[in-house]
Amino acid sequence: MRVAERVIEDMRGREILTWPAVPIKLFHPIVFNFVLSLVPLFQFRGRVVQNIFLRRVGKYGIRKCLVEDLPSIISINWAALPEHYSDSFFEERLRESPETFLVAEDEKATIIGYIMCRIEYGFSHMKKYGLARKGHVVSVAVLEAHRGQGLGKALMEEALKGMRDRGCSETYLEVRVSNDAAITMYRNLAFQTVTTHHGYYRDGEDAYLMSKAL
């Protein structure tokens, strides 16, 4: 069933209340035409889902992650990164920090990238002493065929907004010392290298810990 047909079917027999409380049939022609004009905002995936993008990047869109997106995200994680996590880990991050778990999708609504973060409270990376509410960028990835479009930066910027909304005063991440492209992007976003974790990754490679104030 096409999106427009599904919207029409869902509207039949339903009412809304205006003020004063006067019921108006949703299938009233005026109301129907207004709702139909909103159809481009909807996407049919076995059901009608309102698809509101936080940002558009060319033919791509950045939006919050949905539970049904997780299988695609896990596949991207395995395809694009050497660091992998359990299914339950992804589920926990989405449940705990939905504002900072975002996806990028193309014009066919195929997910091609994501960013996953967590909100923490602990010692500050930006101050010599003291505690801070921090946003931790756990994992960010874009499929190789879609890189070079600014999607990684867009995902980062939108996730940082989510961290600010959650009251974080700073953010941090770990990155392989050999990942020049990612390091350059983070520096362009005003991240600073705080320290080096030697042998941080399972294969023995070192990691830079990078941080910035929000």
At which residue positions do the language-model features occur?
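Conserved hydrophobic/aromatic "anchor" residues
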Residues: F90, Y114, M185, F191, ...
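Conserved glycine-rich acetyl-CoA-binding loop
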Residues: S139-E157, R164-R166, E170, R176-T184, ...
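Short beta-strand "wing" residues that participate in macromolecule-binding interfaces
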Residues: C117, T193-V194
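C-terminal "cap" of GNAT-fold acetyltransferases
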Residues: S169-Y172, R176-D180, L189-A190, G199-L214
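Acetyl-CoA-dependent GNAT
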Residues: R55-R56, Y60, V67-A145, M156-R166, ...
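Residues at secondary-structure transition points
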Residues: K128-A132, G150, V177, Y201
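Conserved N-terminal entry element of GNAT/NAT acetyltransferase domains
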Residues: R2-E68
